[in-house]
Amino acid sequence: MLFTVAWASLAAMFSFSIAMVVWGRNGDGTLKF
């Protein structure tokens, strides 16, 4: 159970960071940090 939760959170953070990089390179401007 604990391993599954940890793996799910790790995958979520990884995909989120990938999405941030993609959006950042897109030059959309709506999401700027």
Swiss-Prot record:
It is a single-pass membrane protein. It is found in: Cellular thylakoid membrane. GO terms for biological process: cytochrome complex assembly; photosynthesis. Keywords: Electron transport, Membrane, Photosynthesis, Thylakoid, Transmembrane, Transmembrane helix, Transport. One of its GO terms (cellular component) is cytochrome b6f complex. It holds the Pfam family PetN. InterPro entries: Cytochr_b6-f_cplx_su8_sf, Cytochrome_b6-f_cplx_su8. The chain crosses the membrane at residues 2-22. GO terms for molecular function: electron transporter, transferring electrons within cytochrome b6/f complex of photosystem II activity. Component of the cytochrome b6-f complex, which mediates electron transfer between photosystem II (PSII) and photosystem I (PSI), cyclic electron flow around PSI, and state transitions. The 4 large subunits of the cytochrome b6-f complex are cytochrome b6, subunit IV (17 kDa polypeptide, PetD), cytochrome f and the Rieske protein, while the 4 small subunits are PetG, PetL, PetM and PetN. The complex functions as a dimer. Belongs to the PetN family. This is Cytochrome b6-f complex subunit 8. It comes from Synechococcus sp. (strain CC9902). The lineage of its organism: Bacteria, Bacillati, Cyanobacteriota, Cyanophyceae, Synechococcales.
